[in-house]
Amino acid sequence: MIVGVAYAKPTVQVWKHVDVPEGTSAREAIERSGLLAQFPEIDLAVNKVGIFGAICPLDRTLAEGDRVEIYRPIHPEAELLEKKR
């Protein structure tokens, strides 16, 4: 089955389609996507993940067409930085 795995930084967004077997978890799809090697700053012990904007555990079993999103931690002063713009 085909699922998507997405990660975004302020300067680059990546969305990969990954062919995975039935029963694949979010963690397994992320590992198969190659994004952990491409973006070594991703730490699955720290970064939250979700499917279509809803946070989920890494062991969540995926369905055909799901989009797994890897979220960056929010900077503690992000709101202040946004107001300065």
UniProtKB/Swiss-Prot annotation:
Domain of life: Bacteria
Matching SUPFAM superfamilies: MoaD/ThiS
Family designation: Belongs to the UPF0125 (RnfH) family.
Protein name: Protein RnfH
Organism: Cereibacter sphaeroides (strain ATCC 17023 / DSM 158 / JCM 6121 / CCUG 31486 / LMG 2827 / NBRC 12203 / NCIMB 8253 / ATH 2.4.1.)
